[in-house]
């Protein structure tokens, strides 16, 4: 079982991530080729089910490519029982061909230097990474190097295109009660369920990059264009992000309590706002900003009526929200959307900040870089002593 293996292995320290456990087994001695420099015979990544406490969502056995890895595959096949408590996939590493359904993970792969392993994407229109667009435009050009295939919508991907890609892994976002992945499940390609977005700790999600670093490369200067070693790069990048985040948090704590911030706008008859223990709720707290739902204990979104928001948040100082496409929304346009916005003090004072996620790589950059979003909220709450806003515009 996973628990028995974990006892025998070397468990990596996860300081913030609650949904991911990584256990390394063996010392990797005798490894050669693609596996050279790997400090384990195989590794186990256990993803906890975010929607059902005490259960596992998925289990991955990462086995380096090469002859030693081939022997490990045979050895584990003999040893393992078939009674696993969750889906188990064996992934040979480094993964050199993948279909990546999630834009922030594409961005992370560029930062780790393993972008050439991206061979297919979904929801191309929503990806704010110029090189991905450029490589996707080369799709169908037989002489092009490392083109990217547009695999359609992540909700209904083009199965034929994915089969033609021959990916070694598919990265996607799992959802509660999804009932599986339909035809994707039948391809017998490892599906990496990237549940990192369900981590409530901002640094918890970022810490998952250690897992992705292990997936996408260990050998220096690979011939397919994967430069450097993704695993140590991920470790050092996370250490840098953590240091910057904690430094910003400490600086913000030295100021008086900041302005109150309200996020998002009304959608239909509902106004979704972050729970007090959600990623955004924690970011606002760490920015030493005031938040009308800071005492709430939910780690997800709160579905509120507009009347509930206005009753509690009329005196809010700053209103910051995201929108997709088109020009920034004027106050007149916002009132056309919902006349009740005029009851907000922030609206009347003109303290409205917007970010267009169709042109600004907000999700791509902030998902694994919480320090960038923390800085943004600190500026909104305490003024520009921390510099200029990067994402939001007044």
Where are these regions (language model features)?
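N-terminal ligand-binding lobe of clamshell/alpha-beta domains
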Residues: 1-394
């Amino acid at each position: 079982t996973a628990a028995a293996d974990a006892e025998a292995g070397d468990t990596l320290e996860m300081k913030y991530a609650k949904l991911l456990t990584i256990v390394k087994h063996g010392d990797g001695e005798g490894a050669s080729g693609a596996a050279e420099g790997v400090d384990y015979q195989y590794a186990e990544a256990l993803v906890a089910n975010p929607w059902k406490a005490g259960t596992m969502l998925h289990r991955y056995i990462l086995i380096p490519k090469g002859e030693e890895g081939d022997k490990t595959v045979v050895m584990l096949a003999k040893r393992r029982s078939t009674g696993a408590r969750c889906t188990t996939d064996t992934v040979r590493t480094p993964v050199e061909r993948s279909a990546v359904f999630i834009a922030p993970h594409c961005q992370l792969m560029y930062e780790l230097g393993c972008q050439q392993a991206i061979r297919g994407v979904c929801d191309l229109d929503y990806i704010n990474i110029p090189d991905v667009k450029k490589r996707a435009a080369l799709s169908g050009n037989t002489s092009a190097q490392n083109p990217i295939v547009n695999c359609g919508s992540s909700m209904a991907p083009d199965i034929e295109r994915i089969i033609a890609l021959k990916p070694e892994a598919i990265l996607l976002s799992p959802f509660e009660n999804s009932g599986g992945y339909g035809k994707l499940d039948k391809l017998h390609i490892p599906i990496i369920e990237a549940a990192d977005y369900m981590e409530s700790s901002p640094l918890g999600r970022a810490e998952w990059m250690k897992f992705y670093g292990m997936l996408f490369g260990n050998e220096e200067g690979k011939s397919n264009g994967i430069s450097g070693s993704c695993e140590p790069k991920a470790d050092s990048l996370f250490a840098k992000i953590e240091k910057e985040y904690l430094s910003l948090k400490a600086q913000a704590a030295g100021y008086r309590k900041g302005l109150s911030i309200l996020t998002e706008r009304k959608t239909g008859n509902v106004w979704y706002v972050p729970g007090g223990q959600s990623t955004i709720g924690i970011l606002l707290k760490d920015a030493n900003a005031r938040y009308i739902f800071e005492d709430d204990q939910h780690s997800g979104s709160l579905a509120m009526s507009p009347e509930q928001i206005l009753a509690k948040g009329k005196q809010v100082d700053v209103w910051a929200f995201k929108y997709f496409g088109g020009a920034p929304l004027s106050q007149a346009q916002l009132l056309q959307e919902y006349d009740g916005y005029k009851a907000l003090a922030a609206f009347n004072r003109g303290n409205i900040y917007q970010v267009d996620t169709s042109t600004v790589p907000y999700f791509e950059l902030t998902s694994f870089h919480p320090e960038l979003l923390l800085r943004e909220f600190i500026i909104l709450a305490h003024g520009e002593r921390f510099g200029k806003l990067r994402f939001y515009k007044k």
